[in-house]
C-alpha cells in the first residue's frame, strides 16, 4: 500500500513523501512531488537570444533574491515552472549553458525542447508571472529512492531496471554491475543523467528482491500542464493525492474545442481510454470513456467510475486519445 506523508505551514507545504513497497517483478510508479525550489521570483519582459549554435532562445529576467547563474550547475537539467499568473502550470526547459553566459538575473529558455509545454509564448503573457526554477528528475536520482539499494548486473536480464515509455513502446534501462552506470540494450552510453519529465512515470523491474521506494519532495501548489498527444502517451497527474477521471478533466465538453476534446464511444476500441498498470496481474487494466462523454467503465462492467479515485500518485498509467490537446491543464485538487 502507498504511504503519503505531508507536513505544511499556513502558506505552503514544507515537505511530503510518497512511499511504496515494491515486490519482485514489475511495478509502476509516478513522481508527483517536486524538489525544493532553487529560485522563486517574478518574470519580467523577455528578449530574444540564441545559443552558441545560433538556435533561438528566450532570455527571461527574473526578479529574485538570487540570480539564476548562482544556482544553475553546468551539465545538470532544470526547468522553469510558472506557479502563478496567466501561464500558471506551464513548464519551460532551461538551457543551462546559455543561461550562464547571460547577464545576471536572466535565464535562457528553450521553447524547442520537447519538455517545454509551450512552443511559443508572448512577452505580455509571461511578464509578471510567478516562476520557480526546479531541478529535473533523473535515473540516478530515482536509483537513490530505494531501500535496500537497487542491484546492478552487466547482464541486463539479471539487473534491476527501469522501463520508460516513448515512441509507442517501452525502453529498458538497466543498472550495470558497478551500481552507478545505466545502459540500454545496444548502447554503451551512460544514461544515469537521463531526465524523467514531470508528466512521466516509469515501470520498475526488480530482480534483486522486494524494496521500499520513497519519493520525497514538496507538493505542487500550482495547476499542472499535461499536454495530450494523439495515440498512447505516459501520464502523471502532477499531484500527490488520488484523483478521479473527472478531476483529471477526462470528460467531453469541458472546455477544449471539438478537435482537441476527449472522444467517447460505447465500443471500447473506438473510445479514448486510460490504462493503469496493475502489478498484481503484471498487466494493464483498461478504462474507457462512454459515448455520453462522462461515464468511465471497464470492459464487461456497467459500473460508472467517473468519480472514483483511479489515478494514484504511485502508479504508472497510459492515456489513449484520438485527439491531441496542447493546452490541457489539470487543476490543483487541494
Residue ranges and their predicted role:
Residues 173-218, 286-334:
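Charged, amphipathic alpha-helical scaffolding segments
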Residues 140-165, 220-284:
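Surface-exposed interaction/gating patches
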Residues 8-124, 135:
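Autoprocessing Asn-cyclization modules and mimics
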Residues 24, 30-57, 157, 171-172, ...:
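Long, low-hydrophobicity ectodomains and other hydrophilic envelope-associated domains
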Residues 26, 91, 159-160, 197-201, ...:
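Extracellular structured ligand-interaction cores
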Residues 87-93, 168-173, 281-286:
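Surface-exposed loop/edge segments in extracytoplasmic proteins
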Residues 75-85, 131, 160-164, 272-276:
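Short conserved beta-strand and strand-loop elements enriched in small hydrophobics
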Amino acid at each position: 500500500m502507498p504511504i503519503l506523508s505531508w507536513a505544511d505551514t499556513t502558506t505552503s507545504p514544507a515537505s511530503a513523501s510518497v512511499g511504496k513497497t515494491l515486490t519482485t517483478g514489475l511495478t509502476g510508479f509516478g513522481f508527483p512531488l517536486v524538489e525544493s525550489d532553487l529560485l522563486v521570483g517574478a518574470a519580467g519582459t523577455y528578449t530574444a537570444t540564441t545559443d552558441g549554435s545560433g538556435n533561438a532562445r528566450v532570455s527571461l529576467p527574473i526578479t529574485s533574491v538570487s540570480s539564476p547563474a548562482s544556482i544553475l550547475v553546468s551539465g545538470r537539467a532544470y526547468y522553469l515552472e510558472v506557479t502563478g499568473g496567466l501561464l500558471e502550470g506551464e513548464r519551460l526547459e532551461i538551457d543551462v549553458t546559455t543561461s550562464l553566459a547571460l547577464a545576471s538575473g536572466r535565464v535562457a529558455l528553450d521553447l524547442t525542447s520537447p519538455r517545454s509545454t509551450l512552443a511559443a509564448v508572448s512577452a505580455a503573457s509571461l511578464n509578471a508571472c510567478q516562476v520557480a526554477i526546479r531541478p529535473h528528475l533523473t535515473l540516478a536520482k530515482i536509483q537513490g529512492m530505494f531501500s535496500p539499494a537497487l542491484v546492478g548486473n552487466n547482464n541486463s536480464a539479471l539487473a534491476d531496471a527501469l522501463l520508460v515509455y516513448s515512441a509507442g513502446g517501452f525502453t529498458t534501462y538497466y543498472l550495470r554491475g558497478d551500481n552507478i552506470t545505466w545502459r540500454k540494450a545496444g548502447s554503451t552510453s551512460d544514461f544515469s543523467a537521463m531526465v524523467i519529465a514531470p508528466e512521466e512515470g516509469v515501470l520498475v523491474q526488480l530482480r534483486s528482491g522486494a524494496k521500499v521506494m520513497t519519493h520525497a519532495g514538496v507538493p505542487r501548489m500550482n495547476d499542472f500542464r499535461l499536454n495530450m498527444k494523439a495515440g498512447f502517451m505516459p501520464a502523471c497527474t502532477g499531484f500527490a493525492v488520488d484523483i478521479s477521471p473527472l478531476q483529471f478533466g477526462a470528460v467531453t465538453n469541458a472546455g477544449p474545442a471539438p478537435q482537441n476534446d476527449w472522444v467517447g464511444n460505447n465500443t471500447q476500441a473506438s473510445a479514448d481510454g486510460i490504462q493503469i498498470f496493475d502489478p498484481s496481474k503484471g498487466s494493464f487494466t483498461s478504462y474507457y470513456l462512454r459515448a455520453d462523454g462522462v461515464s468511465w467503465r471497464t470492459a464487461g462492467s456497467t459500473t460508472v467510475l467517473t468519480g472514483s479515485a483511479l489515478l494514484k500518485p504511485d502508479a504508472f498509467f497510459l492515456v489513449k486519445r484520438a485527439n491531441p490537446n496542447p493546452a490541457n491543464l489539470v487543476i490543483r485538487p487541494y
